[in-house]
Amino acid sequence: MELKSNSSIILVAAIIILILHMICHKDKFVVLFLLLLIGTPYITNTAVNTCYAHAAKLDHIPSGIPKAAWIAMGLQSNDYIENGWYNSYNWDIYTENNFDTSATTDACIDSIKQSVREFASHPKTCLKFFYKKFISQWNDPGYQAQITIEWYSRHRDDQSDLALYFIYGNGRLILESIMNFYHFTILLGSSIFAFCSLRKHELTNTLLSLCVFGGYFFHLFWEAGGRYGLCYFVL
């Protein structure tokens, strides 16, 4: 068990802001906060992993699927949903390599290199790929909630008429209209805030903006998913 990748983005953003604050204000006391900020996740992760390993009577928690698998998957075309979305590649490649983390990592790196070569050879295809991936993830005001509910409700026969109306009927269109409005309103307000914060050169006010833009950059390469954008929307 370890710090989730999305949480790592926020951690890195906070570290960047603290370092810039220390440089600008010559505040050496910030070093203490930096050590705590970096050390606390490591200590807690180690403690949790140790407890789980002890409970499972293992020497250590297996490494599992490498993070490179999610990057490789994020650079693959996906005709079922959209480019870079989940396609079970991470699990498939892990099983193909007999659950060997090292061998899986090598296979994922080969896949990443192949994707990069294809993008480099076909720049227009590359731009189209990332455009579709970016739009499909960040222009979803429902953050994948509606399609997820639909997926998991298709084989249930105990749903109320109200639920059916909002999942499959015209109620779905009403919800989409409401979500489109508040989604646009929040993004517009956030953009204005980010612009004003940059003009004022106030580091503390730029933390949230840095987290959001870090998320944008991170998910250009990582596996895409509408639900991943929800935490940044809250920020």
Predicted regions and their residues:
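Membrane-interface alpha helices of multi-pass inner-membrane proteins
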Residues: 1-4, 14-16, 36-42
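Membrane-interface anchor segments at the N-terminal boundary of transmembrane helices
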Residues: 132-212
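Transmembrane-helix signature of polytopic, lipid-linked glycan biosynthesis machinery
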Residues: 1, 196-197, 211-226
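Transmembrane-embedded, aromatic-rich helix segments that form part
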Residues: 6-21, 234
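Membrane-interfacial entry segments at the cytosolic side of transmembrane helices
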Residues: 24-39
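Membrane-proximal stem/loop segments at transmembrane-domain junctions that anchor or position
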Residues: 52-158
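Structural signal for the C-terminal ends of transmembrane alpha-helices
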Residues: 16-26, 194-200
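Transmembrane signal-anchor helices characteristic of membrane glycosylation enzymes that use polyprenol
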Residues: 37-53
